[in-house]
């Protein structure tokens, strides 16, 4: 347990993760439990409200380049399922600013997005069409951006 004064900034370092808490991130002074164990970063409970987000950095140096490009931070929910946390990569870290405390892990996006054409049937001629409708979905990490070319 660590005492976190709301008027102070903190940096916690673990073998595979770092946590940065800015000044005034909490509404009041708190005792929080924070640790890393078996590749899981535990930052207390989701029930503690935050005034500002905190930054978590998780080390991905143990992965080779082809896997490192597909890593993201997953937040473990009450149902033990992980949900995607928006993040960016810098050097050997995946970095996210989170607005909720909880448990975080490195996940690897192993499922390709699904791209399907809407309102066109097989062997249908499309050269006279002005618009094409396409549905893009991804059940794992989501689709951040896309580009279509014909």
Region locations from a protein language model:
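C-terminal beta-strand-rich structural cap/linker in extracellular carbohydrate-active enzymes
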Residues: 93-112
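Solvent-exposed loop/turn segments flanking beta-strands in beta-repeat/beta-sandwich domains
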Residues: 66-69, 137-150
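Short edge beta-strand/loop segments characteristic of extracellular beta-sandwich folds
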Residues: 20-22, 55-61, 131-139
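Proline-centered linker/hinge motifs at extracellular inter-domain junctions
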Residues: 10, 110-116
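Proteolytic processing hotspots in large secreted/extracellular or virion-associated proteins
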Residues: 28-76, 125
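Short, solvent-exposed loop/edge segments of extracellular or virion-exposed proteins
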Residues: 117-123
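Solvent-exposed beta-strand/loop surfaces of large extracellular or lumenal domains
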Residues: 74-90
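Predominantly extracellular/luminal regions of secreted and cell-surface proteins
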Residues: 4-29
